[in-house]
Amino acid sequence: LDEDKIKELYIKKCYNRIQVHAESKQIKGKVVVVFNIDEGPKIRIAKINFTGNEHFKRRKLLKQMETRQKHFPTFIFPGRFDQKKFESDIEKVKEFYMNNGWLDVDIGWEIIYREDNKNMNILVHVKEHERYYVESLNIHGASLFTEEELKEKLKLQEGGPFYLDAVDKDTYQIRLMYGEQGYIGAMVKEKHTFTSEGARVNLAFNIDEKDRYYIEKISA
C-alpha cells in the first residue's frame, strides 16, 4: 500500500478529508514504513447545485450524472463522493451541452464543506456561451434522391441548432436510405466549417453512391 491507495480506500467510505503521512523508522535494524492516518469526519454529498445554467434546469443536468446526493433510502443513495467519477460526470454534462449546440461551454466545480463537518455541497459553475446554429446545409453527389428528400430525414436543418451528436446520426441516416435501395456500398462524408461571423456552421454531406446491388438468386 501507499498513501494514495490508503486515501482511495477511505474516500470510498466517505472519509473525504482523510490525511495520510508515511514515515520510515528503524526497528531492530529493519526499515519499517509507518502510516499516520487522520481519518477526519465521514462526509456525504448533501446537495449538488448549478450556477449559470440558463437553458437547462438543474434536474435535467443531474440526470446526466451518476453521482447522487444523499437522500432516502441512504443505503441506496448514501451521497458518496468519488472524485474520478464526478470528473467523468462533469464531462458528461459538457457533452450534453455540446450535443445541444453549446460547443464552447465551460464547466468548473467546487466543494463547500458544511459547518457540521458531516456534509458537503458541490457547486457546478456553467458558462454556456453562444449556441451554434446551422447557417447552410448542402448535399452533393446525390442522384437517387433529391436534396429535399434527404434533408427532410435529417435532424440538422438550416437555421436550426447545430447538434454535435446529430452529425454522425445524420451521416448514418443517409447511408441507411441508400442501403434500403440496394446501394450498400454508398459512402457519405460530412464536412462542417465555422463561419467568421458569430456561432454559425456551414454543413455539407458529400455522397459517393457507388453501384447498386441486386439479388440474383435466393436458395431455399
Range-by-range predicted roles:
Residues L1-A220:
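Interaction-mediating elements
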